[in-house]
Amino acid sequence: MKGKPVLTQVSAEMMGQIVESVFVTMMNLEVFPSQDPWAPSNDQLTSAVHLSGEWNGAVLLECNRWQACRFAGRFLSMDPPESVNDDVRDVLGELTNMIGGNMKSAVTTGLTLSMPCVTDGSDYGLRVCGSEVQDRLGFECVEGPFWVTLLAVAPSRLTGSRLRN
């Protein structure tokens, strides 16, 4: 039985459709592509999930703290928390997990998706070894701009490590 063909590139169009679908379905929040430039901020939260298997990479969702609180309020159908708490982190992680999960099912069979992790602030470095930014998509909604970044590991980088040879 043949599985899905391995896609080595996930199109920006596909990622945009996935993000739009997740935000509308889970928060009744329309999002639109934006050209706002990405820049690290001390006020940002970054959520990440990693995909591994026949295709390897990660999906990052980045927004400011205020937005994350607003997203949590919408997602949980409650007043938004006044500050970042575990509910806010859980919602941001779940949104990223849903984006990654939708991407996982569109790419190939046999991929695993990590648990989401959420980082607060910008004084850190996130490195998925061997990966490069494939796409960084900006979005706009009533809560302001946010970004989704797709990191992809080139297949040659998976076998080319001197540590594994």
Regions found by a protein language model. Name each.
Residues 1-165:
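N-terminal auxiliary interaction/assembly segments of multi-subunit proteins
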